């Protein structure tokens, strides 16, 4: 809750402040200053306007509530910000919920239950009748994750909920202070203005958003005008030209990164450590060189100039017998005189050395000495200048010679006690050479005599500090000039930095490689066989199964072993638990529908006792009235899986049967559905859950579709718990096919619930821009029809199947691909449908027909399904894969998605398929295995993966929507794709983006890899198709990693986190061309001899390369023991230039190509186009959106089975109530199954059903009696209860012989004498645990018991809405969340025991009202 704007002192003493949602633009109040005169008086208060039905509150606070804004406070708050609540790392309830929050849309959907009005159907903004304020005005729908904006809706449209532009109404409402628009409207208005306005001096240079990135791309390509792009590069439209400019921007970043990698690899060392000369250890100079003043000079080919009679210009002193100078130290022949020693070494009196004052010609005798320091002092010819090279000519010639190397000495040699060496700074001096000074010829300091003989104070040490402290630095510099023999073995700071960068990079790269390798080994040895494993499965059985899988994957058409595919006629009940003692008796209640599962129910009701309830021996069959139950009936919402149908296997009654007294035909005949097994039927050791097998089809062939559907239909998962759903993306024909893809699929169906010729197309909101946002589709429901040539008759199971065929809107009848909206749209058809079912939101006519189709072919309401298996239409699934994937889901509720292993069926077809075998293998068993250890698989392949629709939460029956989460559906259903980033995410890499969305929305849940689940597929066999496929994959990978790198909540921290791994993957993917080029370069210079290259061998790089390329082979050997894959690895290594150079480079340059290229070819298409283009204007008037209950009311009214008034006020009279002749005063806002076919007074009446309590019968909220019902559009309020309903009562209600003392408006309650003994009055339970209490507003709280039969009130009651329900229960009041609880928990109604003989209604609330579905959290500020 954000604070109100404060003008004076307030205090927070009242317990229930008004609840509101903070807007994104809300500004926290400034705290009062110390000079504020109101500070001294705490009696002044500020009245806050009542909101949401709460009373007005007076708020004030004391002196210590705020710190002075102008003072410096110790907490570190800025002077102008004041006190603000900071985000906490350990208190998630304190995090600020803004439109960028990962659960923003989910909380918005949950908070909408608090709004006191229904969504508008006219486009007018609704107002609160109490204070003229729109409830929920502070609710901000927020921006899309990808900043979705659009303004393409026709102004004359009737459904303005799709409006995103700046309409006149929105502008007017924005200008009116008291009618502030919602956050969604304001966001869309501002965004619409932003796209149209010009950007500084650049003008309107590109369509779409003009952010810093687009400005950079435009400036980078400003020298290339649009007409050049259109003529040369073929980009005609402004959107295509924008994508081309963005592509150039991304290519520039790739080049920057590759240049940076190349500089770090090669240039950095040369830059910071490139001036280092060749270094030779002291004493290692060869006979072809001389050592002079610490440097080695190569004189092997040098000839001494003509000098007297000794040298004639063709001889070298190195090889003359009188010199033999090769390998000697000739420093005394080229002495550094009169520099640092000037004034220190002076001529002695009577010296024979040439001198001029203090300047001398030489100091030492000009003789050679050994480079190892073994020569004794030789003072011969000290006055002879022949060898001293003192002339300027000799000195200039010597200076022209470049030294070959530096002579260096290690510290071990410096400390050699046989020598008298010392180090000054970096120079090594031989103090024994001072003995060559003749004191009769030169004068020198006494310090030289101190050190010329070995002195432990100086010898073998670094004397730099000692010399500096003693003030003898000039002496040391002089010694460096005359007796330096080399340099100490040191390394420059640049070389240190170079090596540091090298080894740090090595550590990170090898660390990542070894950690990934180690985790993959851990996964392969300890985790992989546990995932999806069945209890009691031995190691030998697992190895046998692995061998059978390898044989199975050799051919795409090879069937799996017969024993793994169950027989169609099998009725094995091996998993049924048997009890020694009987569980029923003749006194047991006849409740075949009320046997609950051991797992929590999929419906929202009350959490009650979890003990199993057996069926009575007298109640094995249900009467026909119970068989006419429509979807959403209370008969179907008490268990998760085992009691979804109103009959048992031993019941021979058809649901479409009619009773003698019930002549109304059942609208949903279910006589041919697959029976549901017993609740304790666990053939695989875990409770069964309902699964949808989603197959997205586009232009596949008959063989490909048949292969996929056969494999799904013959899986060993029970048919009662699986549904095959095929969504055909448009009326398209594959290349060479004579039939449209929907026609092919429809030919594979039988026993359609509605004849194919009678199926009509229904509208829905598609993922597109322009008029294509309106799409139409047909829904066919039936059973899968096998081909006896592909599946033997004994294996042909009866599997329900639904086909959704997109046929397009009337404007695209003549298009090449009518109805085609992309694979993402096909997935959203299902995801959006599941979300609307879970949240009881308005749905389109297609989704309503979809709901009924699922019900009619399965007998299972769609909200019962928990998982969805996504399979491409060219994939064949191993028979037990679905079972093993569901086992992972059931055993670990934290898993929200998983994928199996995809194997190649055409391994040896061409060289193109051969190079892909190991790539597929290592991507699963190395990359995904490593990510699975941490529960963060970043990419679940769309060809074979499973997602969790909803997850159980706790032990009280709560559910958390996962795939059906509004945040995931909202972001995944992005319809305006106007940037290169969004196009690569949503048009090419939709499967990977869905994985990214789930990780961003639920970073603490798991995405895992299940190697036990296996499928096989056909990979591209030509390089052209492979190039097109990998272009899509690589580009989508880059953009998805960019999204995933922003997720901060992944496991780990800093460098030891999945976020850092994602960053390394991103950089590694972008620099792949440079990496393979550098690899080839290193291999080449390693092969070429060092004498030719002149460079040392890169051993570190070679070791790194060996680990990177060799560890996958080791992984194969120690985990799978499939030696054949080592051969495939060698093929892969040979093809590395293709994978790392050709494919990435091609992909980056074609990043603005958003088509599927050669992967999917269709007939009749000249040039393929992407799905993101905008054509025309979207007119939403063609789309009708209502809640399921409203559709159902209208259907029943149109078929004449119920009056129009019955949709507002019904008396529910149960067919099998204890006293069928006494009508029940159960008031319902909907026409339920019991009012549709009550069947009172029939011979089948019994005590099966519990007395149901509806929301309407318990709601304590009523509108004003003066409400004008005529002005309420579409979702009109019910008429007063005293009004005539006009509904014909059932025969039993009029012929029962009992007077109708409980008609509408009656105030008389039944007495104990006229109530059946089996009737148990409803009472409000007293909750002992605070966590069990439903969260109720104060005005709803009741403490006294309430009888189940209530008299009809004088005016219509508004029903309350609770959790997820498939009925329209009307508006509700705002509920106050517990201040200490960050998560809003809405308890389901406690299921009463069978002895109370009651059945929970789908709209039952048990007398309590909540406003948020399970797991929803109110905003916390």
From Swiss-Prot:
> What name is this protein filed under?
Chitin synthase 3
Residue spans with biased composition (Low complexity)?
Answer: 124-133
* Keywords per UniProt: Cell membrane, Cell wall biogenesis/degradation, Glycoprotein, Glycosyltransferase, Membrane, Transferase, Transmembrane, Transmembrane helix
| Polar residues: bias regions | 1-16, 38-56, 595-604, 636-645, 1256-1271, 1291-1314, 1396-1406
Membrane topology of the entry = Multi-pass membrane protein
**GO terms of molecular function:** chitin synthase activity
Q: Name one Pfam family in it.
A: CHS4
Q: Which organism is it from?
A: Cryptococcus neoformans var. grubii serotype A (strain H99 / ATCC 208821 / CBS 10515 / FGSC 9487) (Filobasidiella neoformans var. grubii)
What's one GO-annotated cellular component?
A: plasma membrane
Segments on the Extracellular side according to the record's topology features? 234-247, 527-1067, 1119-1122
